[in-house]
């Protein structure tokens, strides 16, 4: 009938909407709490693994090494490790995580020199570095390296043109890194390299040859860019009597 009140519109079901909204909030809060607890558990577990997995002089795994000095630590997780019998580490030295230390080509190989790899006192070997010894690598005291440094005393030969390189007999030449030296990130030290005391090696350099005490070297191949002269201080270039 004309003039009668129209049919009232249905009222929204406020109670159901509120309930669903509250459930959503509670669910989001629960997920946040779960992520928070999981995050704490993962990091606490990883820190426990780092503490428990580190190798010190009193660790059971230290018995595999030729020596690990008092106060030294090989951080967890390690890189590849074999030939530990032929590796000696001095006192108060820190070997970072993911560092590979090896002596010989395969585990269990009998070596002709002992130690094959020696790392001195108060050294720090940066994360992800590789020290790959076959004859003799001698790293002095107070040597620090940045991450991802590669040091080896062996290269493959390539003289025989009828043989592929990787099947040719390798050449071993000792490596010496003098006390107090610093090797920047990504340095490669090749067989036969000899660094004097307190040598600074620029990041990314490839080192071969012999370098005197108290110099800065950089480049591919590395060359002396600064040197110290008593009475004159630090000077640019290699100086008189210093090779490039």
Question: What residues fall within each predicted segment?
Answer:
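A generic "structured core" feature
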Residues: 182, 196-206, 214
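Short coil-to-beta microelement around the adenine-binding A-loop and adjacent beta1/P-loop entry
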Residues: 174-175, 193
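Histidine/lysine/aspartate-rich catalytic loop segments that bind and position anionic ligands
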Residues: 140-162, 167, 172
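Domain-scale signature associated with acetyltransferase and cell-envelope carbohydrate enzymes
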Residues: 1-152, 178-180, 187, 197, ...
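Flexible glycine-rich beta->alpha loop in the catalytic core of nucleotide-sugar glycosyltransferases
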Residues: 149, 156, 205-206, 212
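Conserved hydrophobic/aromatic beta-strand scaffold that supports enzyme active sites
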Residues: 206-208, 216, 224
């Amino acid at each position: 009938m004309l003039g009668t009140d129209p049919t009232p519109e249905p009222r929204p079901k406020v109670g159901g909407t509120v309930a669903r909204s509250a459930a959503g909030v509670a669910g989001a809060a629960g997920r946040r709490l779960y992520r928070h607890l999981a995050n704490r558990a993962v990091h606490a577990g990883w820190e426990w693994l780092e503490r428990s997995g580190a190798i010190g002089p009193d660790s059971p795994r230290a018995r595999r090494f030729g020596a690990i000095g008092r106060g030294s630590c090989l951080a967890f997780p390690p890189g590849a490790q074999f030939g530990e019998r032929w590796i000696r580490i001095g006192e108060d030295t820190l070997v970072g995580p993911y560092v590979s230390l090896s002596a010989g080509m395969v585990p269990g190989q009998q070596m002709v020199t002992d130690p094959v790899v020696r790392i001195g006192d108060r050294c720090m070997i940066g994360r992800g570095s590789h020290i790959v010894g076959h004859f003799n690598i001698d790293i002095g005291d107070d040597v620090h390296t940045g991450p991802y440094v590669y040091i080896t005393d062996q290269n493959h030969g390539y003289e025989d043109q009828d043989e592929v390189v990787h099947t040719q007999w390798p050449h071993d030449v000792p490596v010496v890194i003098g006390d107090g030296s610093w090797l920047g990130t990504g340095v490669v030290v090749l067989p036969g390299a000899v660094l004097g005391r307190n040598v600074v090696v620029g990041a990314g350099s490839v080192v071969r040859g012999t370098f005197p005490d108290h110099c800065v070297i950089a480049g591919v191949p590395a060359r002396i860019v600064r040197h110290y002269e008593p009475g004159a201080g630090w000077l640019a270039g290699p100086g008189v009597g210093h090779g490039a």
